[in-house]
Structures are given as structure tokens and as C-alpha cells.
């Protein structure tokens, strides 16, 4: 259970998760550039690589090689213990959609 919590403990790792959730299968170079451009995180490739190791060890990422390119894949199933723990906290239940915000036309 602690692996998932450790993995999301650092803001840079949360940014990597968010980035891969939005656009999966990115290279280390792509992630490094997007973390700078979208999250204002000026990390070196070596620093991003270290965060990726933590995410891989927690089961949140896998890596595959396509020719000479290594891409990173997000696996959010490893966050299930974190989601389960949060669900037990009072006030963290998902709220039903507000019917007044329905944008469909009848």
C-alpha cells in the first residue's frame, strides 16, 4: 500500500502521472519538456528519470522499447489502494452531478 502513497508524495511525480494520463506513451525527453512547459517544473532528464524509477517500482509505469525509443506507459490500477483509502475518509465520496448543470437540450 505504501508504494502508491510514496509514488504520489512528490509534486513532480504527480505531474508525470497527470501528463501520462492526458497523453500516454511518452519518451523521457517528451516528459521532461512537457513538465517544463505545462507545469513549470525545470527538471533535468536525470531528475525526471529518477522520478520515473519510483513510479515504475510502485507499479504505476511500465516501459517499452520501440526501436531505439523508450516510451513510458501509465497504469493507474496501482493507485487502487490510495483510492480505497481516500474513499473511507468522510467527505470524500463522489458527488452526484448537479441536475441544474445539465447542458442537454430537450
Q: Which residue ranges define each predicted feature?
A:
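Hydrophobic small-molecule pocket/channel-lining residues, especially in calycin-type beta-barrels
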Residues: 32, 40, 59, 102-106
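Short alpha-helix boundary/capping motifs
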Residues: 33, 44, 59-60, 83-84, ...
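N-terminal helix-turn-helix DNA-binding core of bacterial DNA-binding proteins
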Residues: 6-7, 11-44, 69-79
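Short, hydrophobic-biased segments on the C-terminal half of alpha helices
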Residues: 52-53
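Beta-hairpin "wing" of winged helix-turn-helix
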Residues: 56-67, 73
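Short, Lys/Arg-enriched N-terminal segment that forms or immediately precedes the first helix
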Residues: 1-5
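Amphipathic alpha-helical dimerization/coiled-coil segments
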Residues: 18-22, 74-106
Amino acid at each position: 500500500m505504501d508504494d502508491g502513497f510514496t509514488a504520489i508524495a512528490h509534486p513532480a511525480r504527480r505531474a508525470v502521472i497527470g501528463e501520462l494520463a492526458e497523453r500516454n506513451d511518452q519518451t523521457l525527453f517528451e516528459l521532461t519538456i512537457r513538465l517544463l512547459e505545462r507545469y513549470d517544473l525545470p527538471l533535468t532528464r536525470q531528475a525526471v528519470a529518477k522520478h520515473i524509477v519510483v513510479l515504475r517500482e510502485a507499479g504505476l509505469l511500465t516501459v517499452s522499447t520501440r526501436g531505439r525509443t523508450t516510451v513510458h506507459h501509465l497504469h493507474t490500477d496501482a493507485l487502487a489502494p490510495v483510492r480505497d483509502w481516500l474513499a473511507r475518509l468522510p467527505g470524500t465520496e463522489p458527488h452526484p452531478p448537479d441536475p441544474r448543470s445539465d447542458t442537454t437540450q430537450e
